[in-house]
From Swiss-Prot:
Family: Belongs to the LDH/MDH superfamily. MDH type 2 family.
Protein name: Malate dehydrogenase, cytoplasmic
GO cellular component: cytoplasm
UniProt source species: Oryza sativa subsp. japonica (Rice)
Entry-linked Pfam families: Ldh_1_C, Ldh_1_N
Length: 332
């Protein structure tokens, strides 16, 4: 029995990440090889031609799972009936811009898109915010879409999570699929805390802690953390543009695990609405370790937190509280 198509919105679809993400969705990478999709692509009016070109390419690729395409600059049309919304569109920080300027631009974007989603999206729409500042954009979206359940509004830290797994696999010369349960705590920014204290590697003699195998606490507590924190900047330096392919791939991972579930014994990182777990202030969108089942995420509870971790977790929470204050000041 063929499944009903799911409607997936990508905002900022004509941009770099959109160009990498849209074919992944159309191929079934995000929702599964048996799940038909109807793509809704939104961008701003100056990108109309580019958006139409993307639509032409999607037609030309003849994706079997792609059952329809809505390409539009109208936010209401874009949001109507969508089951999944991936918010890639935002206002990027340009040289010489103050953080407050960027924040106020994004606050107005996310305020209007929140209203459109609230009024027109499918009832249990799942939202993933990718555009920076991702955690705070997601918080604004939550504020202005009160009827969307708060558990349905998330932000992307899976890219950082995957970067952490990648660094460990390179260091130990193992397959990345054999590394699991790294954690990204906090903000999708350079204050995030990549934590390996609970991470393990599959070896011929069973699962072993990453700390034990790396056997270099100095590296794990300094270079590993800063490499993951600064990876986005390193890619901009190398490519002269921001990471698009890896961001798109991790957005698919985030939604796929959320919708289809995480493997037994594995947790992943998602930016979700804090309930006060691990002493993180409630009312922030903060990256936690989660497991997913039946289309719902649950924060992994009871992990021991050492003093080193506590400081880092508090520092990134502090930054998020400051961003929240800044964002709210832009509303007035």
């Amino acid at each position: 029995m063929a499944k009903e198509p799911m409607r997936v919105l990508v905002t900022g679809a004509a941009g770099q990440i959109g160009y990498a993400l849209v074919p992944m969705i159309a191929r079934g990478v995000m929702l599964g090889a048996d799940q038909p999709v109807i793509l809704h692509m939104l961008d701003i009016p100056p990108a109309t031609e580019s958006l139409n070109g993307l639509k032409m390419e999607l037609v030309d690729a003849a994706f079997p799972l792609l059952k329809g395409i809505v390409a539009t600059t109208d936010v209401v049309e874009a949001c109507t009936g969508v089951n999944v919304a991936v918010m890639v569109g935002g206002f990027p920080r340009k040289e010489g811009m103050e953080r407050k300027d960027v924040m106020s631009k994004n606050v107005s974007i996310y305020k209007s898109q929140a209203s459109a989603l609230e009024a027109h999206a499918a009832p249990n729409c799942k939202v993933l915010v990718v555009a920076n500042p991702a955690n705070t954009n997601a918080l604004i979206l939550k504020e202005f879409a009160p009827s969307i359940p708060e558990k349905n509004i998330t932000c992307l830290t899976r890219l950082d999570h995957n970067r952490a797994l990648g660094q460990i696999s390179e260091k130990l010369n193992v397959q990345v699929t054999d590394v699991k349960n790294a954690i990204i705590w906090g903000n999708h920014s350079s204050t995030q805390y990549p934590d390996v204290n609970h991470a393990t590697v599959k070896t011929p003699s069973g699962e072993k802690p990453v700390r034990e195998l790396v056997a270099d606490d100095e590296w794990l507590n300094t270079e590993f953390i800063s490499t993951v924190q600064q990876r986005g900047a390193a890619i901009i330096k190398a490519r002269k543009q921001s990471s698009a392919l890896s961001a798109a791939s991790s957005a698919c991972d985030h939604i796929r695990d959320w919708v289809l579930g995480t493997p037994e014994g594995t947790f992943v990182s998602m930016g979700v609405y804090s309930d006060g777990s691990y002493g993180v202030p409630a009312g922030l969108i903060y990256s936690f370790p989660v497991t997913c089942s039946g289309g719902e995420w649950t924060i992994v509870q009871g992990l021991p937190i050492d003093e080193f971790s506590r400081k880092k977790m508090d520092a990134t929470a502090q930054e998020l509280s400051e961003e929240k204050t800044l964002a709210y000041s832009c509303l007035n």
